[in-house]
Amino acid sequence: MDRKNIPPELLADVKNYLNITWNDDATDAKISGLIASGTAYLDSKGGGVLDYLADGFPRTLLMDFVRYARDEALDVFENNYLSLILAMQNERAVTDGMEITE
């Protein structure tokens, strides 16, 4: 997901999660960049393009990735969220396996 193509509803949801109640271009640009970085990171962990608009592991992880990135704490994100990252990978593997057998 490119920073210029962040769905407006995703940007609004992330800002809400971060308790950002104001609107300004600089904040939106920063959060959009963090969302783009987070989706690239999580897509690489998930093995493909993930759905961040639907509730589930990818969306949950993205929200917290952006929170950690905004707070300059990405060095501990993967360690703190390893169990959720693995759960996301397992869920995707099961879903992909089910599609192959159908």
How would you describe each model-predicted region?
Residues 1-102:
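Divalent metal-cofactor coordination and adjacent catalytic microenvironments
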